[in-house]
Amino acid sequence: MRIDIVSLFPEFFDAFFSHSIIKRAIEAERLSMGVTNPRDFSHNKHGQVDDTPYGGGAGMLMMAPPIFEAVESVIAQYDSETNSAYSIDEMCDEMSLIGNPSESIRRRVIFMGPTGQPFTQEKARELATYDQLVLICGHYE
């Protein structure tokens, strides 16, 4: 299983990956993790990824283009890695991998929010059936 996290604070996850159950799962190659900063996909020199709400109002919103591009990037990277794991002969025998490798990949993109569903053991079991999870973490005050 591959879990990719899109976050404005990628350094927050360093300690999380290097301890306890997550660390052991990574070492046993049962899990791979990655963190992508949407600032890397910003369209200006300041790395800006937030903007004022359309129509005015208080607060700030995350801009869509850097988030979309970050998600597209981690999906493309995973598809490339999994596709490169097959030789040409194996790909010819496995018709579902020809053309669009993502057809055979079970993936879920989840935008984390303050009003979302609680994370339960049942939800963990459901998500564990996917090949790739992409978690988009917002920044809330």
Give residue ranges: language-model regions:
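Short, acidic/turn-prone active-site loops that include or flank metal/cofactor-
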Residues: 10, 139-141
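Short, flexible coil/turn micro-motifs enriched in small/turn-prone residues
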Residues: 50-54, 133, 140
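N-terminal nucleotide/polyanion-binding subdomain common to many enzyme families
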Residues: 1-75
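S-adenosyl-L-methionine/SAH cofactor-binding core of RNA-modifying enzymes
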Residues: 63-87, 91-93, 97-135, 139
